[in-house]
A protein has these predicted regions:
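Hydrophobic alpha-helical segments and their boundary regions
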Residues: 4-5, 149
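Sec-dependent N-terminal signal peptides
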Residues: 5-14
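A beta-rich soluble binding module of mature secreted/lumenal proteins
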Residues: 17-172
Length: 172
């Protein structure tokens, strides 16, 4: 009985981490094969696991089990070294919906919600975590134009993200 209660508690504690923020809708007609590859972090809301990092990238590739290998990499200026974190991601619902769960510390998963995406060329995306304290602007290159930056920032602000706190990442 105790083991069952602990199992239920663990499910309840970890299930909240794969939710979708209010008013945020994952993209549909998502094609994983087009999303795979290297993405540059253009901007993010601050979190301890990325604090102080520049030149941040994420590489996505297929895993043998059908999931996605996630390799995040960033440079710590204060430590003068590269930092990497490898994780795995799986679709939460249908594979044509930009809604995945990602883990860097199994068995714990967090949401990866793609809610804005260049549907033709997959050149930029807006991604959130389980709540609105997580936000990333990603692109295929290390920079995006000012107009696109403004459009993406305004879209996130309209949905309730605190875009005044965005950290714009340098890639030099």
């Amino acid at each position: 009985m105790l083991l069952r209660n602990i199992s239920v508690l663990l499910v309840l504690l970890t299930s909240g981490c794969v939710g979708i923020p209010r008013n945020v809708t994952p993209v549909t007609n998502f094609k994983l094969e087009k999303y795979l590859g290297k993405w540059y972090e253009i901007a993010r809301l601050d979190h301890s696991f990325e604090r102080g990092l520049t030149r941040v990238t994420a590489d996505y590739s297929l895993r043998k089990d059908g999931g996605v290998r996630v390799l995040n990499r960033g440079y710590s200026e204060t430590e003068a070294k590269w930092k990497e974190a490898e994780g795995r991601a799986y679709f939460v619902k249908q594979p044509d919906q930009g809604y995945l769960k990602v883990s860097f510390f199994r068995p714990f998963y967090g949401s990866y919600v793609i809610f804005e995406l260049d549907q033709e060329g997959y050149q930029y995306s807006l991604v959130s975590g389980p709540d609105k304290s997580y936000l990333w602007i990603l692109a295929r290159g290390p920079e995006i134009g000012d107009e696109l930056k403004k459009i993406l920032t305004e879209k996130a602000a309209t949905l309730g993200f605190d875009t005044d706190k965005l950290i714009f990442v340098t890639h030099q």
